[in-house]
Amino acid sequence: MSRVGKLPVAIPNGVTVTVTPDNVVTVKGSKGELVKAMSNKINIAVEDNSVVVTRDNDHKDVRALHGLTRALINNMVTGVNEGYVKTLELIGVGYRAQLQGKKLVLSLGFSHPVEMEAVSGVEFEVEGGTKVKVKGIDKELVGAVAADIRKWRKPEPYKGKGIKYENEVIRRKEGKTGKK
């Protein structure tokens, strides 16, 4: 039995979960609605105030899907209830972020500003010009958009300049010592 998969997903007040016979899970909450198609090898049932995920057999691929399905449903329930936030920090001289409508404009030392359009389901928030918050209800989408922003200038190990996640620790390297 999967250690993750055997735990039921608690459904908080204000959140409704429905499962169709072909394993399409719909989660509605105060922040929005998420719909995701799950594998037919897994059984999903809504009982009382929880979602129970079970499997029919112990094949390796089904065991792997068991924990995955439970985790995905848990992420959906948390997303529509609380939402997800990824915070990015811009470190470097002249590195700035600003919002123009729903568009995020980054000055990252290139000859041109980097413009990113907000994907549906994700919104940006800029604090002090050097902190960007990516908010949304879909954990996967929030993480993907944050990774897209970060890839423009990954933190470099010598001075630590670049775009990093809020609690990310950058391994620093020693520079060259030179001749004496």
Swiss-Prot record:
Q: Which GO terms describe its cellular component?
A: cytosolic large ribosomal subunit
The species is: Clostridium botulinum (strain Loch Maree / Type A3)
Q: Which Pfam families match?
A: Ribosomal_L6
Quaternary organization: Part of the 50S ribosomal subunit.
Biological process (GO), any one: cytoplasmic translation
Cite a single GO MF annotation.
Answer: rRNA binding
Q: Which UniProt keywords apply?
A: Ribonucleoprotein, Ribosomal protein, RNA-binding, rRNA-binding
Chain's gene name = rplF
Biological role stated in the UniProt entry: This protein binds to the 23S rRNA, and is important in its secondary structure. It is located near the subunit interface in the base of the L7/L12 stalk, and near the tRNA binding site of the peptidyltransferase center.
Assigned protein family: Belongs to the universal ribosomal protein uL6 family.
Recorded protein name is: Large ribosomal subunit protein uL6
